[in-house]
């Protein structure tokens, strides 16, 4: 906490001095907790849900009302809508199936089996029979069966489950039996039901939309087909409705997503629930992608199908696949990877990787941590001293009940060299998926590498860590370890850097895995010629 009164008094006497000196009150974060190792974390929406919401708002702006159509559709409705074509259409539908409820009796043999488990049945026989009978009749849910058996016999639920497994094997041998109910394969099957019910409830014309999941039994899933997808569908009912409404709605809807210029091409499929010559494919031009794309289909429902539902006015239906539009908007190549990214490779950008490169060894004690900055400044200031040369830094630390006198010597004995090597000020950058050490100056850098390094410096993401920074933290961390182990001296020698570990850096395994899988590189090679000797008294 600041001593506010002292600061105000100091500022009243000499504002400039107070302004400069109080900067030390703002303590900098430790290096592994500083930017870019810390990064903002944002929630992330899913592109399909984003597209759904954008489509919802687009429909609402155009005056449509939102409805939820039935997901479960009786196969009889498919026959009513498709006529003779229904059999072929039903091949792509998923049928709902359920397990039958076996007629399980409580015979003498089963009573004997239960009693062999150490449970007396005689006084609970009637209660157990009622439970089994209730299950058969459907008055008892299957997920309550074990609990009710346990309660009836006054035993634990574990023992109740054992009885179900060992005494009533009929439950293990059940096979699902299909019903006549299907999961809707397209939104049309629901629109007939909805429009039919609204005919006597809403004045004509009316405009409806629904965005929801459909299910289609594809032979296989691939980059453009899934067995479950979202349909963004609308229906307009009114006496004067025709395919011109479909064209206008397609333009109004899709122009809100950046499409311009539209082509309406007769669809060769000719589904029987549409009036002949009305089923139309919509192609739209996307200026950013610079290509024509098929994005929607519309048509006017057949009077034959409408009449079976008591609908006596034309109904235009337009539908488009949400995933298709999301792929276009997000420039995705594979619908599976877009919808289920968790099952595919997670891509880290350079900013992500930069947050995953950290110092390996960092001192814990604040006094020793602060010593690191002094050591860094001393090395940087004198890096070009001509050898033979030596720098010394001395400090005294309180450690427990003792004092530690520390003498740090940085030296170069060989003549004709600098105190430190030319790569000592190299800085770690992320660029194009690579981790690279970039020099402060490009003087002396080979031309074949210069362009890459220059781009890395201007377009990449810096970690803010230089070789000398990381190495000095290695020295002070080793000093702290020596305090604990009561070591009196140690040396640090780093001639040539070949890997991150040579300069006291580590990278998260997730980032490392991506770098290796993408054939990217970690190239931090460079001469630093650091020689340090530390004595502790």
UniProtKB/Swiss-Prot annotation:
Domain of life per record: Archaea
InterPro entries in alphabetical order: aa-tRNA-synth_II (IPR006195), aa-tRNA-synth_II/BPL/LPL (IPR045864), O-Pseryl-tRNA(Cys)_ligase (IPR005246), Phenylalanyl-tRNA_Synthase (IPR002319), SepRS_C (IPR041590)
Gene Ontology biological process terms in this record: translation; tRNA aminoacylation
Binding, substrate: 186-188, 231-233, 273-274, 317
Keywords: Aminoacyl-tRNA synthetase, ATP-binding, Ligase, Nucleotide-binding, Protein biosynthesis
PROSITE patterns with a match to the protein in the record: AA_TRNA_LIGASE_II (PS50862)
Family indicated by similarity: Belongs to the class-II aminoacyl-tRNA synthetase family. O-phosphoseryl-tRNA(Cys) synthetase subfamily.
Protein name per Swiss-Prot or TrEMBL: O-phosphoserine--tRNA(Cys) ligase
Organism for this UniProt entry: Methanococcus maripaludis (strain C6 / ATCC BAA-1332)
Gene (name only): sepS
């Amino acid at each position: 906490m600041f001593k506010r009164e002292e600061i105000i008094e100091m500022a009243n006497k000499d504002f400039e001095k107070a302004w400069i000196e109080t900067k030390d009150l703002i303590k900098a974060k430790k290096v592994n907790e500083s930017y870019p190792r810390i990064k903002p974390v944002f929630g992330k929406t899913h592109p399909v849900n984003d597209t759904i919401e954008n489509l919802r708002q687009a429909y609402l702006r155009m005056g449509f009302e939102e409805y939820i159509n039935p997901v479960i559709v009786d196969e009889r409705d498919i026959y009513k809508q498709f006529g003779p074509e229904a059999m072929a259409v039903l091949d792509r539908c998923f049928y709902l199936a359920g397990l039958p409820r076996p007629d399980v009796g409580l015979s003498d043999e089963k009573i004997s089996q239960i009693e062999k488990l150490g449970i007396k049945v005689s006084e609970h026989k009637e209660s157990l029979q009622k439970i089994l009978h209730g299950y058969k009749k459907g008055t008892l849910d299957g997920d309550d069966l074990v609990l009710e058996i346990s309660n009836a016999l006054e035993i634990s639920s574990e023992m109740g489950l054992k009885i179900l497994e060992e005494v009533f094997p009929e439950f293990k041998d059940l096979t699902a039996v299909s019903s006549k109910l299907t999961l809707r394969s397209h939104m049309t099957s629901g629109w007939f039901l909805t429009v039919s019910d609204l005919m006597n409830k809403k004045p004509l014309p009316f405009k409806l939309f629904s965005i929801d999941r459909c299910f289609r039994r594809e032979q296989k899933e691939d980059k453009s087909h899934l067995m479950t997808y979202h349909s963004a569908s609308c229906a307009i009912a009114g006496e004067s409705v025709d395919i011109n409404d479909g064209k206008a709605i397609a333009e109004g809807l899709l122009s809100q997503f950046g499409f311009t210029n539209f082509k309406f091409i007769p669809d060769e499929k000719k589904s029987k629930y549409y009036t002949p010559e009305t089923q139309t494919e919509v192609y739209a031009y996307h200026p950013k992608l610079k290509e024509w794309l098929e994005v929607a289909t519309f048509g006017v429902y057949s009077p034959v199908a409408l009449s079976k539902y008591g609908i006596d006015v034309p109904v235009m239906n337009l539908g488009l696949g949400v995933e298709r539009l999301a792929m276009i908007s997000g420039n995705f190549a594979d619908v599976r990877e877009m919808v289920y990214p968790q099952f595919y490779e997670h891509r880290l950008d350079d900013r992500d990787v930069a947050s995953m490169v950290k110092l390996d060894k960092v001192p814990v004690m604040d006094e020793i941590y602060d010593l690191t900055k002094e050591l860094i400044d001393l090395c940087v200031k004198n890096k070009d001293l001509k050898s033979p040369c030596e720098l010394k830094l001395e400090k005294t630390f309180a450690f427990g009940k003792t004092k530690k006198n520390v003498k740090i010597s940085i030296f170069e004995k060989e003549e004709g060299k600098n105190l430190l090597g030319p790569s000592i000020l190299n800085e770690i950058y992320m660029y194009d998926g690579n981790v690279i050490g970039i020099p402060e100056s490009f003087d002396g850098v080979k031309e074949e590498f210069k362009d890459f390094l220059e781009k890395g410096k201007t377009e990449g993401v810096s970690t803010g860590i230089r070789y000398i920074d990381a190495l000095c933290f290695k020295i002070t961390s080793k000093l702290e370890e020596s305090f604990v182990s009561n070591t009196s001296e140690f040396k640090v020698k780093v001639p040539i850097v070949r890997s991150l570990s040579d300069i006291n850096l580590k990278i998260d395994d997730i980032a490392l895995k991506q770098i290796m899988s993408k054939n990217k590189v970690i190239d931090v090679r460079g001469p630093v010629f650091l020689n340090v000797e530390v004595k502790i008294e």
